[in-house]
Amino acid sequence: MQKYADYIKQIEIESLWSGTKHILWNLDRRVNILSGVNGVGKSTILNKVVKGLAAGGEFPSHMIKGVHLKVEPEEAKWIRYDVIRSVDRPLMNAEMISKIDLTLVTELDWQLFQLQRKYLDYQVNIGNRIIAVLQSGEPDAAFKAQKLSEPKKMFQDMVDNLFKDTGKTIIRTANEIRFNQIGEQLSPYQLSAGEKQILAILLTVLVEDNQSYVLFMDEPEISLHFEWQKLLIGLVLQLNPNIQIIMTTHSPAVVMDGWTDRVTDVNDITIS
């Protein structure tokens, strides 16, 4: 059986660029924030690690030469992970998208489209678990069933709260993510860039289904307004308490809510 890591303990990169910059970064179980001036290699560090993780998360045999990970437990050979990037570029492969009858214009739209599929699967899985619990005949079956549905409700409450200034609310009876705004129905693709970004992050974390995941985020705050930047880390940890965040940022707002001690400067993990 595949043995999955709970989290990454250490990232070592022998040379970030050809023959220079040896990186050794010891990580916190929950929150790790990489800072530094532009061009110092923050995104490169994240990219080198992500590139070495196979699609299914198997890592020792795929790691780029000179990149080493220590994980907990040490014998684990697999990592569940997700990647959030900030740049919302126009879609390059429009041909592929045209086969799907939707107005997907940017990479973030495509990401949301894929997340909608995962969200449907997630709901089916939760529904099956709820049925199994209720059929078990255990005295606390109703309580257990309610606990299973709590993360989805928490996610919906979070999004409604974030979007309240524009009057948007999630339509809770719909299977897919859809919004109501003053009587009009909206799809996620009609949201603003910042709304799409925060929705994509929270939806990604919800469908992880409380499992141990590593969430790589490369400057996720770029299109988020100030208040959302401050809330970001707390919301992610609330939605999946078993997550480990490894992120880069330029924004002081992201760390304002009690995360300043989790900030690491690239220079501090560079061995000369």
PLM segments and residue spans:
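Switch/communication elements of ASCE P-loop NTPase nucleotide-binding domains
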Residues: 1-56, 172-272
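Phosphate-coordinating catalytic segments in nucleotide- and nucleic-acid-processing enzymes
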Residues: 1-18, 24-26, 47-193
